[in-house]
């Protein structure tokens, strides 16, 4: 996270004057960025729920939510309160441990993914050298939670839903990783911050979506499948499997699956923004994020720093929510594919395309001086 040294020194002096121990300040200084990010993700989930309901209503020529606050903006809060008030039921013949741990295995990896997602230069919880691989590795754990939840329910529909989730994840995780491998050589790094910085030279035309158009399309399709969104929501197909792995769940555990679904969609949109859409960089160079020294401003001025950070976050979120709008609109316009079509698309189409796209990129980078 961005840390202002003057502010840090002022806070330390204030803590000493109030008589608080130094360890308490260190704990608060570490936990504050995490809580801030968690609050931001929570607000992002609420916005996604509202957008999804409104976009689906527009596609189907309905009004959508309008009673839960102005224009229905607190519909997510109403849904959460409803789920909290419902009874939490555990199947008598199911495995209670696996049944309880399944939703946790789904939710935790999604929130861990936000550790390596930057919203601006320095606005990141953990700038790892293997940031994009960390995101792929963590996101691949969630389907194991779905499989665990389905198996622990001791229900044939739940078990089939969990097996479908595992098969779907394996089919699309490899093309997704190959798409990331195609982007990484362009910046000579696996760090998410370095990948964004490598796209900052030429504005709109410097984005990786122009240098990797095939990879961008493959990444978009694979991310939809990873998020289990229509037309790839086969693990929870209501017409075939009642509700898939969610069949036996109720109350807060049922809500945890939706708590994981919407942040996962936001994570995929932010990842697409970072890898292919230039991240926090403006489409037009120096228009919205000017160099402060060129304007005669002091680059250490706190006001200028706050303005730069705010604009970077706005640009990143604008790109992410534009990508997210396409994902939501796709859900309500395309029909669900069959299981064999899903696997054929992953293994016979996306995998060869992603592999063929990564080989020329790697060869060019190795041959270039």
Swiss-Prot record:
It catalyses: a plastoquinone + NADH + (n+1) H(+)(in) = a plastoquinol + NAD(+) + n H(+)(out); a plastoquinone + NADPH + (n+1) H(+)(in) = a plastoquinol + NADP(+) + n H(+)(out). The chain crosses the membrane at residues 25-45, 104-124, 130-150, 270-290, 306-326. Its EC number is 7.1.1.-. Keywords: Chloroplast, Membrane, NAD, NADP, Plastid, Plastoquinone, Quinone, Thylakoid, Translocase, Transmembrane, Transmembrane helix. It is a multi-pass membrane protein. InterPro entries: NADH_UbQ_OxRdtase_su1/FPO, NADH_UbQ_OxRdtase_su1_CS. It is an enzyme of class 7 (translocase). Pfam families: NADHdh. It is found in: Plastid, Chloroplast thylakoid membrane. One of its GO terms (cellular component) is chloroplast thylakoid membrane. Its main location: plastid. Coiled coil: none annotated. NDH shuttles electrons from NAD(P)H:plastoquinone, via FMN and iron-sulfur (Fe-S) centers, to quinones in the photosynthetic chain and possibly in a chloroplast respiratory chain. The immediate electron acceptor for the enzyme in this species is believed to be plastoquinone. Couples the redox reaction to proton translocation, and thus conserves the redox energy in a proton gradient. HAMAP family: NDH1_NuoH. This is NAD(P)H-quinone oxidoreductase subunit 1, chloroplastic. It comes from Huperzia lucidula. The gene is ndhA.
